[in-house]
């Protein structure tokens, strides 16, 4: 967005998602206010005038503010009452900072998300949904999946004959529609929805349209009438980062309200709406910090609209058109110089005090170095996100601090590969595993100056599981580090799916014995991602999954008391499940019977699924070699195009594009060889045959004479030997 510029307002401390709003002014000539709730529990209201930020009020610290919403009479468009959710309590504060409402709910969980309209307050915890009408508990629902966000339809005429209707964004890749106390239906998505918002602020022309943003960076629109909903459209945004906030407001001057999207990687995107309710990208802006809130209003000027953004680290800033004068009321030059001199003097005085206190602290620490005294360590919060990316076939790990990061040490129990990230402003060094270093991976990321956000990407082979420890050390004295732990599961590349193709060649693995459904659910929780820690209340549970790295093989799990059945068209998946579940049953001393039915046709089926990926990568590498050779030929010949064929001439013309496309593409680093080798080993384990030496044969075939038929022949010969 070239016509927009950033203006910083203030830094208010770390914030949670959805804890900032713009309060509309109650007088025409006054500017709108900004209210933000911090993780320290304090509520701050700010105003902006003459390029100066003023605090209107600030409440006392307390429990972290989990969610913030604006409310008012249902019949009025003006929403200037502030509602704050902390723990299981909701408070109402007016624009002057006076508390006019307080309600302690009966929720057993922390209220993470909130929606307010009129006398209705909707709260959601991790798995619970509650609606309070005039402080009375009117509706409740217990969800079996994690709830990421909630929104309610705001016009009664849109409900029809149904009760109060809310939409939940759930962790099983669905939007669940709740009518009163009951689950009405769900809308199935391809990825996990993380944010929901009413289309155009009120549900659009039908009042039944809801926008959603997913963890994979997709934006969609769904219609939720009574009886069943449908997806109207879904598009990719400019990056695959998680969508953290969606706001509808007319900032471009078009006919309809625009869609403003904030993301985990700091991108702000604006989409304009056409007459068919479809979205088109207008522009983007990057701030390199996690976005936790976006709101709009006349904060700095009554003539133009400000887009107010809040980040995790607490920065409040606006995006406004550059046509606005940067300084509205320019002060007298003499007064301005005096004020600047005063500020310089204050900064120098503070710097002197900081240096004196730092020296005094170091002396105290040295004197108490024997351990008889106590040393103060700085407390800091690590904001991190550890999510599997199907597009990259790897885990994306984001670390963000309020203070600059000095270095991060990665310590892994399993052999993982570190992948390059474009935005990673750090120097990486790895320590090889040896007698002094028992860890399969030990690496450090030393950051450049003033880096508060670090992005990493790690890749693990399917079947490997274990713990990754991160030691995060900020640039403070004395040196201290905070340890965070993440667990990579054996079937980490399997994503939840809504469909299962029964016509594929299937391998079946069944466990029977004296175990409960909760124990079977625990096995699944340790194997697969996005499985709730608690077992859903059902006699029989069925889950479908699809693998994102080997061409799209499927897995279906059906478990109940005393029985767990796994069906997959990939022998590697069946072998991993058999090994991992057997380990857990032995630890728990549960006696089970194992039955395994193999379909040899599934091997050729898996090779067909992975073939397009291998062929594409080999063609890219081949074109890269051709382009390099032709470029060298061109450097030694002025009229090279006179004797080149049309195909070779095109390769030479596309030299730069081919090299750009081939960047990061490698058969060795892609994990394709590991997929084929694991398939060979898994079939050998399940059939009782040796697969020794077959890995080298697979590598030789891919590097010399790969084709689907040759690979199928290699696997067939290995079976017959």
From Swiss-Prot:
Q: Which organism is it from?
A: Caenorhabditis elegans
Q: What happens when the gene is disrupted?
A: Mutants have normal body morphology, but with reduced body length and width, delayed larval development and decreased roaming movements. May exhibit defective chemotaxis tendencies. Defective cilia structure and function. This is characterized by increased accumulation and mislocalization of intraflagellar transport proteins and impaired movement of intraflagellar transport proteins along the ciliary axoneme. Defective polycystin-mediated cilia signaling and mislocalized and increased accumulation of mechanosensory receptors pkd-2, osm-9 and odr-10 within cilia.
**Which taxonomic lineage does the organism of this UniProt entry have?**
Eukaryota, Metazoa, Ecdysozoa, Nematoda, Chromadorea
For biological process, the GO terms are: chemotaxis; cilium assembly; intracellular transport; intraciliary transport; non-motile cilium assembly; protein localization; protein localization to microvillus membrane; protein transport
What is the name attached to this protein's record? BBSome complex member bbs-7
One GO CC annotation: BBSome
Tissue expression pattern: Expressed in ciliated cells including amphid and both inner and outer labial neurons of the head and in both phasmid neurons PHA and PHB in the tail at larval stages L1 and L2.
Give the main location. Answer: other
List UniProt keywords, sorted A-Z.
Cell projection, Cilium, Cilium biogenesis/degradation, Cytoplasm, Cytoskeleton, Protein transport, Transport
- The coding gene here is osm-12
List all membrane-crossing ranges: none
- Role of this protein: Component of the BBSome complex. The BBSome complex is thought to function as a coat complex required for sorting of specific membrane proteins to the primary cilia. The BBSome complex is required for ciliogenesis but is dispensable for centriolar satellite function. Required for proper BBSome complex assembly and its ciliary localization. Required for cilia biogenesis and both the assembly and movement of intraflagellar transport proteins along the ciliary axoneme. Plays a role in the removal of degraded mechanosensory receptors within the cilia.
Q: Subunit notes for this chain?
A: Part of BBSome complex, that contains at least bbs-1, bbs-2, bbs-4, bbs-5, osm-12, bbs-8/ttc-8 and bbs-9. Interacts with bbs-1.
Q: Which SUPFAM superfamilies match?
A: Quinoprotein alcohol dehydrogenase-like
Q: Where located?
A: Cell projection, Cilium; Cytoplasm, Cytoskeleton, Cilium basal body; Cytoplasm, Cytoskeleton, Cilium axoneme
């Amino acid at each position: 967005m070239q016509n927009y510029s950033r203006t910083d307002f203030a830094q208010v401390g770390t914030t949670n998602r959805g804890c900032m709003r713009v309060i509309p002014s109650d007088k025409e000539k006054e500017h709108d206010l900004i209210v933000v709730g911090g993780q320290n529990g304090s509520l701050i209201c700010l105003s902006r005038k003459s390029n100066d930020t003023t605090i209107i009020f600030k409440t006392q610290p307390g429990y972290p503010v989990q969610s913030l919403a604006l409310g008012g009479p249902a019949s009025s468009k003006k929403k200037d009452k502030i509602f704050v959710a902390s723990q299981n309590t909701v408070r109402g504060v007016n624009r002057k900072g006076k508390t006019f409402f307080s309600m302690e709910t009966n929720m057993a969980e922390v209220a993470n998300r909130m929606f307010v309209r009129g006398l209705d307050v909707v709260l959601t915890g991790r798995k619970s949904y509650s609606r309070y009408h005039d402080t009375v508990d009117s509706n409740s629902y217990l969800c079996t999946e994690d709830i990421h966000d909630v929104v309610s339809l705001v016009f009664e005429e849109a409900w029809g004959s149904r009760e109060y209707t809310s939409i939940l964004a759930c962790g099983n890749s669905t939007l669940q529609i709740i009518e009163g106390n009951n689950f009405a239906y769900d809308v199935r998505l391809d990825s996990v929805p993380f944010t929901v918002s009413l289309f155009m602020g009120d549900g659009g022309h039908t009042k039944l349209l809801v926008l959603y943003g997913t963890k994979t960076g997709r934006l969609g629109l769904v219609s939720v009438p009574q009886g069943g909903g449908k997806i109207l459209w879904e598009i990719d945004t400019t990056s695959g980062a998680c969508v953290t906030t969606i706001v509808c407001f007319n900032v471009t001057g078009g006919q309809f309200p625009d869609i403003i999207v904030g993301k985990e990687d700091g991108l702000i995107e604006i989409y304009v709406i056409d007459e068919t309710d479809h979205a088109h990208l207008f522009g983007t802006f990057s701030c390199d910090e996690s976005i936790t809130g976006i709101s709009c209003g006349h904060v700095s000027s009554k003539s133009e609209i400000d887009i107010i953004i809040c980040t995790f680290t607490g920065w409040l800033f606006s995006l406004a058109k550059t046509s606005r004068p940067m300084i509205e009321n320019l002060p007298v030059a003499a007064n301005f110089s005096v004020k600047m001199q005063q500020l310089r003097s204050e900064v120098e005085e503070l710097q002197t005090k900081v240096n004196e206190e730092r020296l005094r602290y170091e002396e105290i620490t040295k004197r108490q170095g024997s351990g008889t005294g106590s040393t103060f360590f700085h407390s800091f919060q690590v904001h991190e996100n550890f999510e599997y990316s199907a597009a990259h076939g790897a885990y994306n790990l984001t670390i963000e601090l309020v203070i600059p990061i000095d270095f991060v040490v990665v310590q892994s129990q399993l052999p993982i590969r570190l992948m390059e990230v474009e935005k990673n402003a750090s120097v990486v060094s790895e320590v090889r595993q040896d007698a002094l270093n028992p860890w399969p991976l030990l690496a450090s990321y030393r950051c450049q100056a003033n880096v508060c956000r670090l992005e990493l990407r790690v890749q693990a082979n399917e079947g490997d599981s274990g713990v990754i420890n991160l030691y995060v050390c900020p640039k403070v004295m004395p040196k201290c580090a905070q340890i965070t732990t993440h667990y990579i599961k054996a079937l980490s590349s399997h994503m939840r799916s809504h469909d299962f193709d029964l016509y594929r060649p299937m391998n079946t693995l069944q466990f029977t014995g004296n175990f409960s459904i909760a124990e079977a659910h625990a096995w699944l929780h340790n194997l697969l991602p996005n499985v709730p820690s608690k077992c859903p209340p059902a006699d029989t549970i069925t889950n479908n999954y699809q693998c994102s790295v080997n061409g799209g093989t499927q897995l279906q799990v059906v478990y109940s008391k005393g029985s767990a059945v796994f069906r997959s068209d990939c022998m590697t998946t069946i072998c991993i499940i058999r090994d991992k579940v057997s380990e857990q049953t032995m630890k728990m001393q549960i006696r089970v019977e194992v039955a395994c039915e193999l379909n040899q046709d599934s091997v050729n089926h898996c090779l067909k699924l992975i073939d397009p990926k291998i062929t594409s990568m080999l063609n890219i590498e081949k074109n890269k070699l051709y382009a390099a050779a032709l470029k060298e030929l061109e450097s030694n010949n002025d009229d090279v195009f006179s004797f080149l064929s049309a195909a070779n001439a095109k390769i030479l013309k596309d030299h730069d594009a081919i090299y750009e496309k081939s960047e990061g593409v490698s058969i060795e680093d892609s994990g394709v060889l590991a997929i084929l080798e694991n398939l060979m080993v898994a079939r050998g384990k399940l059939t009782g045959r040796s697969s020794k030496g077959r890995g080298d044969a697979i590598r030789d075939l891919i590097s010399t004479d790969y084709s689907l038929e040759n690979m199928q022949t290699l696997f067939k010969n290995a079976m017959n030997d």
